[in-house]
Amino acid sequence: FIALAPDGLSSLGGYPGNDADGKEMQRQIDREKLLNDFFNGFEFLYNHDDTTKKIGAVGFCYGGGVCNALAVAYPELSASVPFYGSQAKSEDVPRIKSPLLLHFAELDERINKGWPEYEAALKNNKKDYTAHMYKDCNHGFHNDSTPRYDEKNANLAWDRTITFFNKHLA
């Protein structure tokens, strides 16, 4: 794989190393500009001479929402793996062409609140998706720099992600 790992906070000096300061920094960012930065990253990879044009996206928290937004915006996207990210609007789901592998944390009430409507839209539009709900986990369970980190479930989710990418991108 060729990877591009943009730091959404780079315009403010980059990720500060902890979630509390990171959340404060996120409040200072122009969300539309930030999303366009990620879209530009997709276009850079898609048009790069060294890629096969099979582009996948994986994102965590806000980046999970970016993965859903990329799936809506780019029919060329080959695979999308949002980890506990905000969902696409139901009316936008018909535009999704890429397969989705969605990871959710059972205790993440804020993100999970939107899942039933999103899943219904995915089903109604016959989209290719697989969703996993990780038991007794909280939002951010894959982030090993926080107390919410759950090594067992993080490893399982990552194994599933690599298998998914091998299937759709290799």
Give each language-model segment a name.
Residues 96, 101-104:
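Short beta-strand/loop motif that positions the catalytic acidic residue
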Residues 76-86:
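A conserved short beta-strand
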Residues 1-46, 143-145:
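Serine-hydrolase catalytic machinery in alpha/beta-hydrolase-like enzymes
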Residues 107-112:
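Acidic catalytic loop of the alpha/beta-hydrolase fold
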Residues 6-8, 85, 134-136:
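Active-site loop/turn elements of alpha/beta-hydrolase fold enzymes
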Residues 49-60:
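Alpha/beta-hydrolase fold nucleophile elbow
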Residues 123-170:
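C-terminal catalytic histidine-bearing segment of alpha/beta-hydrolase fold enzymes
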Residues 59-63, 67:
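Gly/Ala-rich beta-loop-alpha elbow adjacent to hydrolase catalytic centers
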